[in-house]
Amino acid sequence: NISKKDSTDFDFIFHFVRWLKKEGIDFPKYLIHLRPTTPIRNPKVIKKAIKFIIRKKKSTSLRSGHISAETFMKWFYKSDKGYFERVHKSMTAENIDKPRQKFRPVYIPNGYVDIYKPEFILKKKKLLGSQMLVFETPRCIEVDEIYDLNVINSLKEKNKQKLLNFLNKIKRK
């Protein structure tokens, strides 16, 4: 059984790809993973991601992300006694006080669109590999908590007509 609380994306994708092979079903060159926890997407952005990975032949996968407003280099842990503990070994309490512009931008994986290569997965028994492309997307809302769901519902009400127009256009094609 692969559907457990600690199951990974690799677990279910690898299971699926092996099942396709076992059943003698030709698998596609690419698998596109659209996570249900990121429900609001622009199809044009997904098309750009597909074109991007097709152009980058040496890539092993593509993972979407948006630039974080803050860098993880400024984050810290709290010790059992309530004191600062660094997340990154080079960061002292003084270093995390530097302006965020002094740090390289970091990307937050967001589930907008991830693309995998089934042949690579079967051969290497890895999902992403060392040549994972970063595909920058607009910032998006992931539904991880009730608060996020409330934000999505508010946006849905605000943009209901745009969504209906888009869906009607698809129906006609």
Where in the sequence are the language-model features?
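Conserved N-terminal catalytic core of the sugar/cofactor nucleotidyltransferase
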Residues: 1-26
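Conserved core of the sugar-phosphate nucleotidyltransferase
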Residues: 6-11, 27, 39-137
